[in-house]
């Protein structure tokens, strides 16, 4: 979310985790706002993720890499439970052609001294082999793979519409998307464990 009110609303609705993205703000403002939201979350038994360094978009907004010293200050001052970083990852990347800068990630891990688990937004673009390596050997605890799953959903929905051109019942149209999405998520988890596809 983009502010304390969104975080409060999510907490009031029963969410168990909130994410605040102040990465486009000056460092001091990002720290202050993220710290405030983390306090609200923690006071309600909810975890909070923050972001430092701006993760750009494939074919769009450019990224701003996470500075290790800033990451250390952010982790220490905000009290977040997880911290999203920008190390070559991009949102909306189709296909696994991306490449995480492992040296930059290692520098952040050293600077933060293991104070906070790290998160990779734009994880759909990270090759499976690299995701597995990072999950096993770095403080990365979460990869966001929304693009990967949305592509699967889109393919399944288009097939459902083609198979049922006169159907109008949304449940009948959307039901065939569930199994492919579940299998896509399971495939990612199997690959993380090194079980194969």
Residue map of PLM features:
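Short beta->alpha connector loops
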Residues: 1-2, 124-126
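Alpha/beta enzyme core
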Residues: 2-118, 131-139, 157-158, 194-197
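C-terminal alpha-helical cap/extension of soluble enzyme domains
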Residues: 128-197
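Glycine-rich beta-strand-to-loop/alpha-helix junction loops that act as flexible
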Residues: 51, 88, 120-125, 145-147
């Amino acid at each position: 979310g983009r502010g304390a009110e969104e975080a409060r609303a999510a907490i009031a609705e029963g969410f168990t985790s909130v994410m605040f993205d102040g990465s486009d703000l000056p460092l001091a403002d990002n720290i202050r706002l993220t710290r405030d939201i983390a306090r609200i979350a923690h006071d309600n038994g909810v975890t909070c993720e923050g972001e430092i360094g701006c993760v750009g978009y494939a074919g769009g907004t450019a990224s701003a890499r996470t500075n290790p010293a800033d990451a250390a200050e952010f982790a220490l001052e905000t009290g977040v439970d997880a911290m999203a970083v920008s190390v070559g990852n991009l949102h909306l990347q189709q296909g696994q052609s991306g490449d995480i800068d492992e040296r930059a990630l290692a520098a952040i891990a050293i600077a933060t001294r293991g104070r906070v688990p790290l998160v990779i937004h734009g994880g759909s673009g990270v090759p499976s082999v690299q995701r597995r390596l990072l999950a096993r050997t770095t403080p990365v605890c979460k990869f966001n793979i929304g693009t990967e799953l949305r592509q699967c959903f889109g393919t399944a929905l288009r097939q459902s519409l083609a198979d049922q051109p006169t159907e109008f019942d949304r449940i009948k149209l959307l039901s065939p998307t569930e199994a492919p999405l579940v299998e896509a998520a399971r495939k990612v988890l199997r690959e993380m464990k090194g079980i194969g596809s």
